[in-house]
């Protein structure tokens, strides 16, 4: 059976268009708020509203998928995000945008949960790593192209909203030509997210998603600040961030394939060790290009491998709930990690960015090394 079936390819095609729209809005909304002379705290609160929507969307989507299936859940999520886009143009103001960014956050999280769950349910224990690697590649390529679009087109609010909303709705079109089957058995009771978070045999995967959120959130949010404080120009900062993200894109497929072939525990151990090495290299002022490349290649691929690990440990009908738990764990890590690291950097040294990344990675490595490798055989394999 082919890994990249027609439903999978069409799903990823639609996701690419949605990711473009999401990346453009996430970049421009803070700038539009600043142009409206809103204070820094107001910009921060609007951003928090979006992430709060992410959390709510993550919690709701499992129920929606069980009720109406993957296809219609995907359509609904896309329409919710499109409404969040278009709503920004109806009334410009703090409270209005607070509400619309919350709506967009709900839609965005629903899209991620639907797509990730559909891919995991479509795959097996032998190819799930490659499926999630393809998903992450589409995500990062879409984010990169979205940033490129921002630099090439008009960034005026009323110029951007029509085509961004159009992109979101166009993301629905590929799935009109296929049906992604929801293979959760109807006679199974709903699985709670809490039970997935407490599942002992999947704990390494859950912890891996939290660590991944801390690492990626810190790199995305604080790496530009670190480089700026080192005297790097804005143009060069863009170049070094491109190196970091490009490494993440290039690492997805080979690492996903290695995880499928040699086992996810071994690959996770190597990945985390490489993240620690990359962090030490940055602290030692070694050649920045190779240091950032190995940091990006290993750090940006932690999430899909940890997710695939956790999904091996549950029954097939529990995959959607497990995906919700993993996305929730990642979101919590990406929210708390940068906040704590930023406080350390402000009060002590910018080098705390890489000390923090190396420290949490080392803790996770100890967890991985404690696992003797005689875990139960994967059960979510059909």
Curated annotation (Swiss-Prot):
Residues 35-44, 100-101, 152-156, 225-234, 346-347 are periplasmic. GO terms for molecular function: transmembrane transporter activity. The lineage of its organism: Bacteria, Pseudomonadati, Pseudomonadota, Gammaproteobacteria, Enterobacterales. It is found in: Cell inner membrane. PANTHER family: TRANSPORTER MFS SUPERFAMILY. SUPFAM superfamilies: MFS general substrate transporter (SSF103473). Keywords: Cell inner membrane, Cell membrane, Membrane, Transmembrane, Transmembrane helix, Transport. It comes from Escherichia coli (strain K12). The chain crosses the membrane at residues 14-34, 45-65, 79-99, 102-122, 131-151, 157-177, 204-224, 235-255, 270-290, 291-311, 325-345, 348-368. GO terms for cellular component: plasma membrane. Its main location: membrane. Belongs to the major facilitator superfamily. YcaD (TC 2.A.1.26) family. It is a multi-pass membrane protein. The keyword Membrane applies. The keyword RNA-binding does not apply. It comes from the Bacteria. The gene is ycaD. Pfam families: MFS_1. Residues 1-13, 66-78, 123-130, 178-203, 256-269, 312-324, 369-382 are cytoplasmic. This is Uncharacterized MFS-type transporter YcaD.
